């Protein structure tokens, strides 16, 4: 599954992501460089195969559902104009 060039934590990240999806997340989220939760639909489908997408192959900043919810609360929501 992992070759020597891969992140050695890639399988563990995928296992953790599967748990977070079972706990209520609709998508796998990583922390981006701006400190925001960034969804990754590609990783969401790959974690059930024990993998992450190429973009996140070296990113260990997987966010739990609690962290995603907390970041959503801290980020001001746009008000829709009616």
From Swiss-Prot:
Segments crossing the lipid bilayer: none
Pfam families per UniProt: Acc5b_avian_CoV (PF05528)
Biological-process GO terms, alphabetical: symbiont-mediated suppression of host gene expression; symbiont-mediated suppression of host innate immune response
UniProt keyword Iron-sulfur present: no
Keyword Flavoprotein: no
Key words of the record: Eukaryotic host gene expression shutoff by virus, Host gene expression shutoff by virus, Host-virus interaction, Inhibition of host innate immune response by virus, Interferon antiviral system evasion, Viral immunoevasion
Function: Involved in host translation shutoff without degradating host RNA. By suppressing host gene expression, facilitates the evasion from host type I interferon immune response.
The protein's name in its UniProt record: Host translation inhibitor 5b
Source organism: Avian infectious bronchitis virus (strain Beaudette) (IBV)
Upper taxonomic lineage: Viruses, Riboviria, Orthornavirae, Pisuviricota, Pisoniviricetes
């Amino acid at each position: 599954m992992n070759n020597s060039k891969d992140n050695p934590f890639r399988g563990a990240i995928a296992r953790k992501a599967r748990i977070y999806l079972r706990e209520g997340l609709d998508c796998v989220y990583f922390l981006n460089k701006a400190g925001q939760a960034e969804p990754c639909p590609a990783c969401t489908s790959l974690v059930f195969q024990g993998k992450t997408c190429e973009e996140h192959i070296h990113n260990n900043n997987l966010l739990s559902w609690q962290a995603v919810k907390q970041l959503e609360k801290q980020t001001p929501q746009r008000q829709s104009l009616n």
